[in-house]
Amino acid sequence: MQPTLFIDRDGTLIDEPKTDFQIDSLEKLKLEPKVIPALLRLKAKYRFVIVSNQDGLGTDAFPQTNFDKPHNVMMALFESQGITFDEVLICPHKPEENCLCRKPKIKLLDHYIRKNLFDIDRSFVIGDRETDMQLAENLGIRAIQYDPQKMNWDLIAEKLLGETVTNCGKRPPRFAEVIRQTKETDIKVQVWLDEAGVNEIKTGVGFFDHMLDQIATHGGFRMNVQCKGDLWIDEHHTVEDTALALGQALKQAIGDKRGIARFGFVLPMDECKAECALDLSGRPWIKFNACFKRDKVGDFSTELTEHFFQSLAFSMLATLHLNVTGNNDHHKIESLFKAFGRTLRQAIRIEGNEMPSSKGVL
């Protein structure tokens, strides 16, 4: 069985026009940024299959010839750069036709399933829509949701290849596993500080899962987080205890801190301005400055943002300063998690062999 990437076409490999959502002319054909370099990096490890919904293909509203011309040029362009696709699987039906082959249904991939043609543990669906995520779930494999800003092709390749980003290779890989069980939560956290990859995060709080993924993605490491908490009450215990377990796991994985950079500072500028300063000092402290207008973002209470970072800092024994300004609460919270991830990436990087302290101990 071969590791396979089942890749969406419109909005993932090529730009999808927001006017009519059809690529029916050469003028509309535009590759997504960095898709060719990423696929070239991935092709030695994965087979590529395109899986695409094309609403009304072959009808007067979307003639087959209008589809074929830009599609064939796209395929020729990929092939000219050394990228080939084993198959191109297309559902031509509209949603109201209720067919069996339209994503997220799996009829298009029936032969892959019946003949065991893909490695379930090492195959992925890559796409920009929720239907792609549901397709992966129906196939029993993992998914990566493409987004040109938040999860672009560079990051996808980094995740799938699990590239070493923080360790020069002269030390054993830095790994830790923490299991934390209380009457309120049952948590398992695993962190691999010296490899990037696909993170498996399930806490039952969707927005929180996304924020934790931001830490690992921008921190350049891989982690798994599984949490079963008393969400019938609220998400407080889940967020707090996950922070405590994650902080403990990071502390254990970092080890005695010999050779690490220790400090990190980042000031990313987007529509929000987020500042983060971190010292893996062994002395826990936090200064947090953020104001939120909304009580919740999705299923996540905004007041828990500060509590998460406070619990994390004290569990890691780290000094942490966070500040954010902006107008959109979703973006402000996300920028804090991203900034922390980028700062942590600097602090855990191995630079030598010395203890980064005049005291000789941290």
From Swiss-Prot:
Protein biosynthesis as UniProt keyword: no
Superkingdom of origin: Bacteria
Disulfide bond positions: none
EC number of this enzyme: 3.1.3.15, 4.2.1.19
Pathway: Amino-acid biosynthesis; L-histidine biosynthesis; L-histidine from 5-phospho-alpha-D-ribose 1-diphosphate: step 6/9; Amino-acid biosynthesis; L-histidine biosynthesis; L-histidine from 5-phospho-alpha-D-ribose 1-diphosphate: step 8/9
GO CC field: cytoplasm
Protein name as it appears in the record: Histidine biosynthesis bifunctional protein HisB
The family this protein is said to belong to: In the N-terminal section; belongs to the histidinol-phosphatase family. In the C-terminal section; belongs to the imidazoleglycerol-phosphate dehydratase family.
Catalytic activity: D-erythro-1-(imidazol-4-yl)glycerol 3-phosphate = 3-(imidazol-4-yl)-2-oxopropyl phosphate + H2O; L-histidinol phosphate + H2O = L-histidinol + phosphate
One Gene Ontology molecular-function label: histidinol-phosphatase activity
Start and end residues of each stretch annotated as Histidinol-phosphatase: 1-173
Subcellular location field: Cytoplasm
Residue ranges of the TM segments: none
Single GO biological process annotation from the record: L-histidine biosynthetic process
Region entry Imidazoleglycerol-phosphate dehydratase, spans: 174-362
Pfam assignment, any one: Hydrolase_like
Binding positions for Mg(2+) per the UniProt entry: 8, 10, 128
InterPro entries for the chain: HAD-like_sf, HAD-SF_hydro_IIIA, HAD_sf, His_synth_bifunc_HisB, HisB_N, Histidinol-phos, IGPD_sf, ImidazoleglycerolP_deHydtase
Keywords (A to Z) from UniProt: Amino-acid biosynthesis, Cytoplasm, Histidine biosynthesis, Hydrolase, Lyase, Magnesium, Metal-binding, Multifunctional enzyme, Zinc
Residues at the active site: 8 (nucleophile), 10 (proton donor)
Residues where Zn(2+) binds: 91, 93, 99, 101
Cofactor(s) needed: Mg(2+); Zn(2+)
Family annotation (NCBIfam families): HAD-SF-IIIA, hisB_Nterm, Histidinol-ppas, PRK00951.2-1, PRK00951.2-4, PRK05446.1
